[in-house]
Regions:
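N-terminal secretory signal peptides that target proteins for export/translocation
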Residues: 1-17
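Bacterial N-terminal signal peptides
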Residues: 20-30
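Bacterial Sec-dependent signal peptides at the C-terminal "C-region" and cleavage site
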Residues: 29-40
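Juxtacatalytic substrate-recognition/specificity segment
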Residues: 38-155, 245-255
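Acidic/His/Gly-enriched intrinsically disordered linker/tail segments
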Residues: 104-129, 150-273
Length: 273
């Protein structure tokens, strides 16, 4: 999925839709300046590369903006992903009605979802409306935005696996992700998705609940498991960044581990003890 092509991703990730050229051209010509200048915005925040505008007061939400900036620093520290060279715009809406109205006005071809990450030839945009999942949605979509602001491409499964990893608060990422229990039970029933199976998923509509859970599991293994696994992920992302054909990450792990799937299962058996 190349970010030079217009696309969007959403928290309800059943589909991926290419924005028509007319919509992309509208955004480029009428511009983000017109979007940003609308009178509806009543609060404004800056955190790292993120510039946020909201049609409601952001008082009480300060912590999540600190977390968004922290995600960028963590991507640098853990994976060597360079800091974004572009700003990433966030637009927050108090209700679903104003959110849907905005999306239909500026992106009429895009189905309305609870949260959207939109990327065309310019900087990425994150659109979210206020709900009890606001902070989770922001962390998830902004992870996509950071990755695609720094890398020319990210494999779909890895893109989603990293977003699932970072969507929870920092203190919960290693041991308290909601995917953990479901992952353990799926392994007990032999429902492990190999990395090769995930790599074959090319469209968001192919990613169901099981695929997201398994994508997160592989990311957790590479972040918190054997150092050799993280080294392969770091080098994989470095090759993408440098324009070197990266091959499949599964092939890299197979050269490091005689049985990567068993290594994954063993990681989940021992890490939480």
């Amino acid at each position: 999925m190349r970010v030079s092509n217009p696309f969007f991703a959403s928290r309800y990730r059943e589909t991926a839709v290419l924005l028509k050229a007319t919509t992309a051209l509208l955004l480029l010509l009428l511009g983000r300046s017109e979007v940003a200048a609308e009178q509806m915005w009543v609060d404004f925040r800056v955190a790292g590369p993120f510039v946020c505008r909201a049609d409601f007061s952001l008082k009480g939400h300060e912590s999540v903006f600190m977390e968004l900036a922290e995600i960028q620093q963590d991507l640098i520290k853990k994976f060597g992903v360079p800091p974004s060279g572009e700003r990433i715009e966030i637009y927050l809406f108090q209700g679903r009605t104003s959110y849907s109205r905005f999306v239909k006005r500026w992106f009429p071809e895009v189905p309305t979802r609870r949260a959207l990450y939109i990327k065309n030839n310019g900087p990425g945009m994150v659109l979210v409306y206020l709900s009890d999942q606001l902070h989770t949605d922001l962390r998830h979509e902004c992870t996509h935005a950071l990755l695609h602001a720094s890398l020319p491409m990210v494999p779909l499964w890895l893109d989603e696996g990293l977003a699932e990893y970072y969507e929870v608060p920092p203190q919960d990422r290693s041991h308290q992700n909601p995917h953990h229990n479901g992952t353990v039970w799926s392994f007990r029933f032999g429902r492990l998705r190999s990395m090769e199976q995930l790599e074959n998923k090319q469209e968001l509509k192919e990613m169901g609940r099981s695929e997201y859970r398994n994508a997160w599991a592989w990311v957790h293994f590479m972040v918190h498991g054997p150092p050799a696994a993280r080294m392969e992920l770091v080098q994989f992302l470095a090759d993408i960044r440098e324009g070197t054909p990266p091959g499949d990450l599964s092939d890299r792990l197979a050269r490091r581990f005689s049985d990567p799937e068993d290594a994954l299962v063993q990681h989940f058996k021992t890490f939480w003890k």
